[in-house]
Amino acid sequence: MRSGMVLTAALVALAACQRDQDGAPVAPAPEETTTAVGASTVLSGRPEQRTFRDWRAACDNGALCFAFAPSVRPDAGWLRLSLAPDARAAPVVMVGLWSPGAERLDPAADLTLTIDGRAFVAARVDDADQPIARFGGPDVVPVVRALAAGKRAVLSAGGQEVELSLSGAAAAMLWIDERQGRLETPNALVRVGERPAATTPPALPRVTGAPAVGQTGFGGDNPTLPAAIEALPAVKQCRQETSWNEYVGKEVFSARLDDRKELWAVPRFAGAYNLGVQVFVTGPGGRDPAPAAFPTALGTPTDTVVNAEYDPATRTLSAFNKGRGIGDCGIAQRWTWTGAAFVLKDQSEMRECMGVPADLWPTLWRTR
């Protein structure tokens, strides 16, 4: 019924060459529960993902929440619901057709979502590669109510029809109501009532990058790895494990972080569409190498990142661990160098491969 994301091989390869460092910094631990402040309640900022039958739901550290529905026939279409944490916010529902030939549909063709015989026409998103449409404003509330109570949903356009699963829809929306303090309020997704809503979103952490520094002598193009890093037992092991491909072994990159610190990335594993590197923070010339500690939204730091790129102008290191080659599922992360450490800037994650573009994945971590 669903197309699962396969990250197992990459994670096993990663684990074979790395061990988390004791005492490594992690993303700031958000509140586990809501907190009362005056007459308002500060919502929980704990990132979380849940599965409700066929539906996936997630809320990030700012209490922005999402729910996703797959097509009954795998890889044919999807539905995305998002809801900001403001008590008066309205949900946004997006749908996407991903069936064979969908990309050739007339760009002006309407996308229609029919729920138990009731048709809702969505506004097309103009700049999407695949047919994607959006319900928003006052038109979205009837759609949400129908999804929660519905038995059958069909997405159609230009003669194509794709059935979307509603199994778990009401439970996923109820969970979002609970996370955002909407139960029994007028703006609840499912359990609507008259209780006044008085909630405040959790404050997002502020991340400030260190000033940019010159990069003369650093970058890509297979720089020579300093001897102090080559001598590390973990690096020797991973050099051996990547020796089957001479091009993988050359995927070393470096950067100057400041006058006293450098960044060096060493290939650790490679697959058809993922390249993992271990990152070290060193002294000048690669001396005194220490594995970098990259915090993650769910609290477990790592020193290995996948398909990584470092932008010295913004002091940002990005990673994109693909669940499959087309990149419609996986984990996308960015960290900012503050002058003392790499701090998580943002993270989004799509566990199910169903054709959702990466810019529409649910966020787990956001910053200011």
Give the ranges of each region predicted by the language model.
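Surface-exposed loop/turn elements that mediate protein-protein interactions on large endomembrane-trafficking
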Residues: 231-241, 281-297, 336-341
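Short aromatic loop motif centered on NTY/YTY
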Residues: 290-368
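Sec-dependent N-terminal signal peptides
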Residues: 1-21
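Short consensus segments that form the blades of beta-propeller domains
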Residues: 102, 268-272, 323-326
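Beta-propeller blade termini
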Residues: 250-256, 305-309
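Exposed beta-strand-loop-beta-strand "reactive/processing" segments of non-cytosolic proteins
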Residues: 252-272
